[in-house]
Curated annotation (Swiss-Prot):
One of its GO terms (cellular component) is cytoplasm. It comes from the Bacteria. Keywords: Cytoplasm, Exonuclease, Hydrolase, Nuclease. Its EC number is 3.1.11.6. Its main location: cytoplasm. Belongs to the XseA family. The gene is xseA. CDD domains: ExoVII_LU_OBF. It catalyses: Exonucleolytic cleavage in either 5'- to 3'- or 3'- to 5'-direction to yield nucleoside 5'-phosphates. Bidirectionally degrades single-stranded DNA into large acid-insoluble oligonucleotides, which are then degraded further into small acid-soluble oligonucleotides. It comes from Clostridioides difficile (strain 630). This is Exodeoxyribonuclease 7 large subunit. InterPro entries: Exonuc_VII_L, Exonuc_VII_lsu_C, OB-fold_nuc-bd_dom. One of its GO terms (biological process) is DNA catabolic process.
Length: 401
């Protein structure tokens, strides 16, 4: 008998009917440790149950979910339900109807033990946190070289702050060698000192997949780093030891890129605000100085207009008038004295004597005031007020004899 080819939906539907009708799979009870626990916004719960070698995807519908149960990653449970196929994806999963809590898984016990130990040593103390540089020149990224994480980090950084230099140190982010590679990367950047900030991260996953970032060796290397480290491991609900010892925890790798870089738009906005404040401050200072100058000028003018100044000016005017009057009076008195002296000198002048009819007799340019030395026929000059006479002596009389 030749069978026709089935559509994928037909094949998945057929498998689903087989699983539902199986007496064991239709009422299956399993035990395991919860991993990838997530409560959807619809109210449905999605998780995986795992043991040392395998895992089984599970669903708890909202109507069957008991919120009083403290379910979380690492909790061991006994689950009862049925196996069916999610036809769209062709994936079989356990649809849980009942849950019984059995205990806590070994990895979560180890996680809590290490967390408590490092906390007591002070590795989580905020005083050891190094501030993240606000405007880095270079950022180191420690993650897988492939996948969405590194692409998201690069895209966010280049969009926000394109001038920054990105240095990738590729590592495996899960597996036996992962922890040692992460430690080597941190030591490398601290030795080179060529970056301002480090981002250590990976995408989401189960506690097993994230376990490298819960490794004590990685935790101590992160704590000892002289370069500030942003931890960006998993999704927002995932927490690792690396998150607690790092200088800053980011909920996602993209958020880490935003924390590590300023936004050019924010920088331009802040610069605009600074410019505006400086301009306003300068304008206010100029206006204040102008007001102060006007106040000083007004005070000076008011002082000059005061009665005290006016009185002093009047007093100075009076003193000036007195000085001028004294000078003029003294000049007048001195002028009168000069007139009198001039008159006296005029009266004593030979010219004044001539005005009264007197003359001056000279011989050879010398004044003659006696007949002694004169002889008949001597030539003499007689000076009058308006001219000279040349005479010859023809007679000499002596009054004494």
């Amino acid at each position: 008998m030749k069978l026709r080819a089935l559509d994928i939906s037909e094949a998945n539907s057929y498998i689903k009917r087989i699983l539902i009708n199986d007496p064991i799979l239709s009422n299956l009870k399993v035990k395991g440790e919860i991993s990838n626990f997530k409560v959807h916004s619809s109210g449905n719960v999605y998780l995986s149950l795992k043991d040392e070698t395998s895992k089984l995807n599970c669903v708890i519908f909202k109507s069957n979910f008991n919120r009083n149960l403290k379910l979380d990653n690492g909790v061991k449970i006994i689950a009862n339900g049925y196996i069916s196929v999610y036809e769209r994806d062709g994936a079989y999963q356990l649809y849980i109807n009942e849950i019984e809590i059995e205990g806590i898984g070994n990895l979560h016990i180890e996680f809590n033990r290490l967390k408590e130990k490092l906390n007591k040593e002070g590795l989580f103390d905020p005083k050891y946190k190094i501030p993240i540089p606000k405007m880095p020149n270079s950022i180191g990224v420690i993650t897988s070289p492939t996948g969405a994480v590194i692409r998201d980090i690069i895209n966010v950084i280049k969009r926000r702050y394109p001038k920054v230099n990105i240095k990738l140190y590729p590592v495996t982010v899960q597996g036996d060698k992962s922890a040692e590679e992460i430690c080597e990367a941190i030591r490398f950047f601290n030795h080179m000192k060529n970056v301002d900030t480090l981002i250590v991260g990976r995408g989401g996953g189960s506690i097993e997949e994230l376990w490298s970032f819960n490794d004590e060796m990685v935790a101590r290397e992160v704590f000892n780093s002289q370069i500030p480290i942003i931890s960006a491991v998993g999704h927002e609900t995932d927490f690792t030891i690396c998150d607690f010892v790092s200088d800053m925890r980011a909920p996602t790798p993209s958020a880490a890129a935003e924390i590590a870089t300023p936004s050019l738009d924010d920088i331009n906005y802040k610069l605009g605000n600074i410019k505006s404040r400086m301009s306003k401050s300068l304008t206010n200072q100029i206006e204040l100085d102008q007001y102060r100058l006007e106040t000083v000028f007004n005070k000076i003018n008011n002082y000059l207009d005061s009665y005290t100044i006016k009185d002093k000016v009047i007093q100075l005017d009076k003193i000036y008038d007195k000085i001028i009057f004294g000078i003029e009076n003294n000049l007048k008195l001195e002028d009168e004295k000069l007139v009198k002296i001039g008159a006296l000198l005029h009266n004593l002048s030979p010219l004044a004597t001539m005005d009264r009819g007197y003359s001056i007799t000279q011989k050879n340019g010398k004044v003659i005031n006696s007949i002694k030395g004169l002889k008949i026929k001597d030539s003499i000059d007689i000076v009058l007020k308006d001219g000279n006479l040349e005479c010859m002596i023809d007679k000499i009389e002596n009054k004494e004899g």
